[in-house]
Regions:
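Conserved beta-alpha
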Residues: 1-207
Length: 207
């Protein structure tokens, strides 16, 4: 019988999350513990890509991590981002997150409605003279690059952050007693096996 489930994601901030409905309906305890975390590249590591942030007139953001690390690197490199820099975001939520770093109204911010890069392309084509920088994770595919190439847009992809194992403390490892594990990516599974090299599934359910 499943009584305790380990969810490999951060705990939801909203009380309306379906996770809490599941816990209440089935009488199970949910433990939220991310197995992976995002780590930004240092300015030294970023310089090795030989990319200058000021060579671009627009930035494409696909996540909040991209925004955080873009502005973190700009600060570390002592670069002042121009007031007329344009930002293209895959969702409105990501676009609004920019307010953490700059005055939203003073910027030219564009966002899609579907959460997919395809939705942004028409807007980017309207600004075809821009030079686009696309911050990415160390683990990424070339879908964005191919889409921008297909529209003959001037762009450059760069790595600004990476996904690493969020290691368990010795106390956490000893206290591990969950009946079910819920993973969301191969990276999460890899991180778990790193922390529990002698883990045997037994009666533990995995989803």
């Amino acid at each position: 019988m499943i009584k305790k489930i380990l969810i490999s994601q951060p705990e939801p901030t909203s009380e309306k999350s379906p996770y809490f409905d599941i816990a209440k309906e089935y009488g199970v305890e949910l433990v939220f513990r991310p197995f992976i975390k995002v780590e930004g590249l240092s300015s030294k590591e970023f310089r090795q890509q030989k990319i200058s942030l000021l060579d671009f007139t627009a930035v494409v953001f696909t996540s909040r991590h991209a925004i955080d690390n873009y502005f973190k690197l700009a600060k570390e490199l002592r670069i002042n981002i121009p007031e007329d820099m344009k930002y293209f975001c895959v969702t409105e939520t990501i676009a609004l997150y920019i307010q953490k770093y700059v005055q939203y109204r003073k910027r030219k911010v564009f966002f899609g409605n579907t959460g997919k890069i395809d939705d942004l392309i028409p807007m980017m084509v309207k600004h075809k003279n821009e030079k686009y920088l696309v911050p990415l994770s160390s683990v990424h595919n070339d879908i964005v690059a191919k889409l921008l190439d297909s529209k003959k847009l001037n762009h450059k992809e760069c790595v600004m952050y990476r996904t690493v194992s969020n290691d368990f403390t010795e106390e956490e490892a000893k206290a591990f007693d969950c009946d079910m594990l819920v993973f969301f990516s191969p990276t999460g599974i890899k991180a778990f096996t790193k922390n529990f090299p002698s883990f045997t599934q037994g009666d533990v359910r995995i989803a």
